[in-house]
Amino acid sequence: MAGENPTASEYIQHHLQNLTFGNHPEHGWSFAHTAQEAKEMGFWAVHVDSLGWSIALGALFVWLFRKAAVKATSGVPSGLQNFVEIMVDFVDKSVKETFHGKNAVIAPLALTVFCWIFLMNLMDLVPVDFLPRLFQVITGDDHAYFKVVPTTDVNVTLGMSLSVFFLIIYYSIKVKGVGGFLGELTLQPFGKWMLPFNLLLEGVGLIAKPISLALRLFGNLYAGELLFILIALMPFWAQWALSVPWAIFHILVIVLQAFIFMMLTIVYLSMAHEDH
């Protein structure tokens, strides 16, 4: 938004708007130039920035861990190898303490979830104007939208939580069978005579799992990003006085939210493997 003096409201709205590509009723397939155009593109519009950054950070995770694995030695680890081993040991210990079934997929899944979400959350520490302004310079569009924190997009967090939800359903049916899975939904906690009430109660609890996973991660990171944006509106001296302490505190939020998402994923999948 160079060349203008936007109001505080316009500045905030601009930073919270995604780079959106979709089929506009009037302009056809194109990038949205306003928030209204993005809204008019409907459900099938794509948030290009969220998608791009999430894929790029996922690829970075794979590259870093593959590099550490290729260069791993039997001696005392150092540098990247040491960091990767600490992460693997931490996640492996968390899985062993929490997951009570037998499934070789759970530990790699938990490691992927934790590291991927951590990297996406970490983008919140990049100065709020740096990458968006760089993108505007590269594209030559001073009004271009560009969000760099994928987990501040509810579509990303909901997509991840739905993936966990489908795994819960899959393993519940695989371990307990269709009858056992349906029995959990209809025969608990009050027996067969209260089947409709059981289904309502258990169904709501099941659906609440992915929704709570998604909204918890989204809400915390969205609030953090909003505070960074508000700090950026302050005088230069105030930005330094407030942004550094908030960034230090926000590091805890970044790690904690990745850890919570990982642990709840392990817990939910452990429950799916319990055959009563």
From Swiss-Prot:
The chain crosses the membrane at residues 45-65, 105-125, 154-173, 226-246, 247-267. CDD domains: ATP-synt_Fo_a_6. Its main location: membrane. This is ATP synthase subunit a 2. GO terms for biological process: proton motive force-driven plasma membrane ATP synthesis. One of its GO terms (molecular function) is proton-transporting ATP synthase activity, rotational mechanism. One of its GO terms (cellular component) is plasma membrane. The keyword Transmembrane helix applies. It is a multi-pass membrane protein. The lineage of its organism: Bacteria, Pseudomonadati, Pseudomonadota, Gammaproteobacteria, Oceanospirillales. Gene3D superfamilies: ATP synthase, F0 complex, subunit A (1.20.120.220). It is found in: Cell inner membrane. Belongs to the ATPase A chain family. Signal peptide: none annotated. F-type ATPases have 2 components, CF(1) - the catalytic core - and CF(0) - the membrane proton channel. CF(1) has five subunits: alpha(3), beta(3), gamma(1), delta(1), epsilon(1). CF(0) has three main subunits: a(1), b(2) and c(9-12). The alpha and beta chains form an alternating ring which encloses part of the gamma chain. CF(1) is attached to CF(0) by a central stalk formed by the gamma and epsilon chains, while a peripheral stalk is formed by the delta and b chains.
